Swiss-Prot record:
An MF annotation (GO) of this entry: sinapate 1-glucosyltransferase activity
Residues annotated for UDP-alpha-D-glucose binding in this entry: 358, 373, 376-378, 381, 397-398
Designated gene of the protein: UGT84A1
UniProt GO BP: response to toxic substance; response to UV-B
Name used for this protein in its record: UDP-glycosyltransferase 84A1
Catalysed transformations (reactions): (E)-4-coumarate + UDP-alpha-D-glucose = 4-O-(beta-D-glucosyl)-trans-4-coumarate + UDP + H(+); (E)-ferulate + UDP-alpha-D-glucose = 1-O-[(E)-feruloyl]-beta-D-glucose + UDP; (E)-caffeate + UDP-alpha-D-glucose = 1-O-[(E)-caffeoyl]-beta-D-glucose + UDP; (E)-sinapate + UDP-alpha-D-glucose = 1-O-(trans-sinapoyl)-beta-D-glucose + UDP
Keyword DNA-binding: no
Residue numbers annotated as active site: 30 (proton acceptor)
Function comment: UDP-glucosyltransferase that forms glucose esters with phenylpropanoids. Glucosylates 4-coumarate, ferulate, caffeate, sinapate and cinnamate. Can glucosylate the phytotoxic xenobiotic compound 2,4,5-trichlorophenol (TCP).
Amino acid sequence: MGSISEMVFETCPSPNPIHVMLVSFQGQGHVNPLLRLGKLIASKGLLVTFVTTELWGKKMRQANKIVDGELKPVGSGSIRFEFFDEEWAEDDDRRADFSLYIAHLESVGIREVSKLVRRYEEANEPVSCLINNPFIPWVCHVAEEFNIPCAVLWVQSCACFSAYYHYQDGSVSFPTETEPELDVKLPCVPVLKNDEIPSFLHPSSRFTGFRQAILGQFKNLSKSFCVLIDSFDSLEQEVIDYMSSLCPVKTVGPLFKVARTVTSDVSGDICKSTDKCLEWLDSRPKSSVVYISFGTVAYLKQEQIEEIAHGVLKSGLSFLWVIRPPPHDLKVETHVLPQELKESSAKGKGMIVDWCPQEQVLSHPSVACFVTHCGWNSTMESLSSGVPVVCCPQWGDQVTDAVYLIDVFKTGVRLGRGATEERVVPREEVAEKLLEATVGEKAEELRKNALKWKAEAEAAVAPGGSSDKNFREFVEKLGAGVTKTKDNGY
C-alpha cells in the first residue's frame, strides 16, 4: 500500500468528482494548514473549493497567480478559490473589536457561503463535505442547513484542544476572577500553571472574543463527523488517545511535510518568497545561524525587539531575522531594529528580510536554532525539521506550546513566559539563551531530541504511519458518502 502522496482516490461511477468545500478564517496561520489539507484532498482525485474573505483574497492574488473560480490541477484532482466580501474595509476601526468583527463575519459568512453552496448545487457540482478551521464555527450551521456532513481542521496542539474541550465541558477547574492563579490539571497533560494554559481561557485575557469564537467550535463539536488535527500520534500520544475516546479526533500531521509531496504551484502565501535568504544561508557554516521570526500576528514590544537584537550581537552568532509589518488592525508601529544590527547585517554577519520560505529555512543545514513565538505551525515545522528552539511565547496557544517544547519535547529553552509577564528580557539573558541552544552539551541534547522528533514526524506520514492511515480513512469516508455518525471510528 502506498503513502498518502501515492494514494489516488477511485471515484464512483458518477461523472462528477466528490466536491469538498474548505472555509478558512483569514490569516496566514489559518489559511496555510487548511490549504495544505485541501491540496492533499484534491491530489487524490477530488474537487476542492477553498473559500475565505475577499480581504485575504486580495493579498493572495497579489502574491500568487490566483484567478477566482479557476480550476487548478493538483495531482489527480483540482482546486479553486472563491472569496466573499465581508463588507468592512481593511482600515475600518470596527475590526479592532474582535467580538464585534467575529459576529459580523458570522452574519455575512453564513449568507455568502450558503450562496456558494447553492450556486454549485445548481451547477451540478454539489458540495459533499464542508471543512472549516477555528474562529468560524458557523460553517457547521451552513452544513446543517444543507444537510452536508462537516469536519474541522484544528490548527493547534491536541493538548490545547483538550484545554478548550474541558473548559467548555466544565469537568476541569480553570482560573477564575477569585482564583486567578489556579493550576490546571487536564487528563493526560502536564499540570499547567495559570499562565501556561491557552491565554484566552484566563479571566484576565482582553481577548474574550477569541475565547468565545473558539468555544463556539466546541459547542458545535457533535455536528462534525471528524476533527482533523495537524499533529501526529507519537508527539502527543497520551492526550490524543484520551481525546479520541471522547470525540472523533484524527491526527493528519505534519501537514506541511505531506504537502511537500504534492506537485503544485498553488499557494496561500500573501508575500512573494525570495531565494536570497537561502542563497545567503548556503554561504554560512553548518549550524551557525540563528533564525528569528515571530509569525504574522504576534507583536513584541519595541523595547524587547531591541534587547533581542543586542543579545544576538552579544552572542556573536550569525542571524536571519524576519521583520514583518504588523497587521493593520493592531494599530501599532512597525518594529525598528538597532543601527548596530543593520551594520552587522551589511557586513555579512546577518540578513534582515520581511518574508522568507520558513519551511526551507528550517530544513537548511546552516540553521542552528529558531527564536520563535511558539505558534503551532512554527512549532510543528521546527520539530519536523529537527531544529532546537528559543521560546518567546506571547499569548493564545503559544504559552502552552512553549511548555511542551521545553518540558515535554525537550527541544527548547525559555526566553520569557508570555505577554502577561510584562517583563522585558534583557540582552544578557538573550545572549545566554542563544548560546545555550547552539553551543555545548545542552545544545547537543536539544538537537538530538529535535532530530528524534523529525524522524517520528517522517514515520507518521510514511506508508502505514499514523497520519497516513488517518488521512486515507478520511478520504475514503468522503468517497463512500459520509453519514452523520457520532462514533469515534468515523
